[in-house]
Structures are given as structure tokens and as C-alpha cells.
Regions:
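Transmembrane helix recognition focused on a "late"/terminal membrane span
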Residues: 2-15, 39-164
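N-terminal signal-anchor/start-transfer transmembrane helix
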Residues: 17-29
Length: 164
């Protein structure tokens, strides 16, 4: 995808947009323009995940649809935090070749590093929380399914049940 007319893009701004507005694709729109397909492709899973959060707040934690929707938001957040890390730690020469050929954009190396560190903390938190949430709900669902089954007759022992 090509960069929009008007040229120079700051590495610092791109890093912080990915950190603060990543799930909405703001960093992609800044670098590639409003017509960027990848930027718009972040909206559906973000909105679906936010809807899952809203469902859980409204209907409680027993809502099984929310179990499926909420991890999408966590995964989008983790993915965009990875993008912020990549942007923040990209070498200056490579960044200037790709996004700032005129060299006009001002970037602050320390703000890039701080943004990358913050993105690492936030992304790791989102990924771990999403994984823990999915695993907890999966095991709760399994326990619910086991408790719904009728118990085995009391007069049979384990050895009798295993015989053909």
C-alpha cells in the first residue's frame, strides 16, 4: 500500500498512535491514508469484542456469547501493541526510507522507546488476560457439560462398566 500524498511521517507519532489508538487502526490511517484496508479491518473485531464486554456487563458472566466475543478484543489489542513495538524500535534509516524520504518529520528516540515499553506491558497484559479468560471459560463450560450428564447407576463398579 502506498503512502498518501504529503510525505513525511513521524516514527514517534506512529508509535503512539499504535499504542493509544491501535485497535481503531489510527496508526495505519496516519501512515497509509484513510483508504487503508488493514486499518479498516481492525474495526470489526474491535467492535465485536467491545460488544462482548458490554454483554458481559449487562447479562453477567454466564453469557456464553460474551465468552467468545471478548477474547477478540484482547487479541486485537495484543496485535496492535506488537505493531507499536515494531514501529518504535525500527531503525531510523529504515523508517526514513519507507515513511520519511524527505527527512522532514521529527522523531524523538526516547519517546519511541517509552512507547515501545508501554506497548510491551499493555500487549502482554492483554494477551495473558485473554488467554486466561478463554481457558477459564473453556474449563467452566466443560464442568457444566459434565454436571448436566446423568450419573452412572450406583450398582455398577468401574470394572463392570468397562467390560464389553
Amino acid at each position: 500500500m502506498s503512502r498518501p500524498a504529503g510525505g513525511s511521517r513521524s516514527q514517534t507519532i506512529a508509535t503512539w498512535l499504535a499504542l493509544l489508538g491501535g485497535p481503531l487502526g489510527l496508526h495505519r490511517f496516519y501512515l497509509h491514508g484513510v483508504g487503508d484496508r488493514w486499518g479498516w479491518s481492525l474495526w470489526p473485531p474491535t467492535l465485536v469484542g467491545a460488544y462482548g464486554v458490554q454483554r458481559m456487563r449487562t447479562l453477567g458472566q454466564d453469557d456464553q456469547i460474551a465468552w467468545l466475543l471478548i477474547p477478540l478484543l484482547g487479541l486485537v489489542i495484543a496485535a496492535t501493541m506488537l505493531t507499536a513495538i515494531v514501529y518504535g524500535l525500527t531503525p531510523d534509516a529504515r523508517w526514513k526510507t519507507r515513511f520519511d524520504p524527505s527527512g522532514d518529520a521529527v522523531s524523538s528516540p526516547w519517546l519511541n522507546v517509552i512507547g515501545a515499553v508501554a506497548a510491551l506491558a499493555l500487549g502482554a497484559t492483554a494477551l495473558i488476560a485473554s488467554t486466561a479468560f478463554m481457558a477459564q471459560r473453556f474449563f467452566e463450560y466443560q464442568a457444566l457439560q459434565r454436571s448436566a450428564r446423568p450419573p452412572a447407576p450406583a450398582d455398577q463398579t468401574n470394572s463392570q462398566r468397562l467390560r464389553p
